[in-house]
Amino acid sequence: ILIPVANPETIEDLVNLALVIKDAKQKNALVALNVINDNNSSEKKEQQGKRNLEKAAMIAAAADVPVTMVSRYDLNIASGIIHTIKEYEATDVVIGLHRKANIVDSFFGHLAESLLKGTHREVMIAKFLMPVNTLRRINIAVPPKAEYESGFSKWVEHFCRMGSILGCRVHFFANERTLMRLQQLVKKRHAGTPTEFSILEEWEDLLLLTGQVNYDHLLVVVSARRGSISYDTSFERLPAQLGKYFSNNSLIIIYPDQFGEPQEIVSFSDPRGHNESQHYEKVGKWFYKWLKKN
């Protein structure tokens, strides 16, 4: 699991998230990454980056988990993350958003866009309003056809493991067909995790979850890269909806694993992949606005 540590305020949450989703059998499972921009590096920034890496290693060491610390020069953060994923064969990336962050919207727009285009690995974008280990419930909104994505069973495993470790219930919301597949998978592989399943008739009904998600709950929204099997144009409205109705909740948006190398993933909706940038840019701009509000 790759953890970029650009923001010292999100490091603890990201490392703790990685600790509860990682496979206990995997050795050297965590890689902390500090990217130094080729164009505007300074000694001060390099020192801060080093401190960030050390902080990540210390938090994981408390749980007796080693961290590989990587500092690299690259053109930008997205490029640094993508290169490190390849070099260290990372299977997942967790990115943090601080609730009071004030980041330039084009920066996050570009980061999200470049990262999701540049890797087919699972990407989690997380914002925590409280420490990970104090969460009382995990609510997961799952879109139709999510069961056909190659990363389906992996993200289910991650959150069932998280629920088991934290001792909290994992509550899945999906349409009937997807819910049936979720129930089969959980029964077969994660029977020990306390789970609950509720019908979410239409993906548009996501807003009905406002009554289900308390302050000490984590809301996980399963999304998908543009052009993938479960991608839906309504995902473009997600940012605005989440920002408006779930701004007081800890939140993870997850983009599951996909088959093939990034450039091989052709779009079902549009083989030429038009409008992809537009979509990710919207997500990026929304994150910026949302973060400024909180």
Region roles according to the model:
Residues H217-L218, R225, A240-I253:
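C-terminal functional regions that serve as terminal interaction/effector modules
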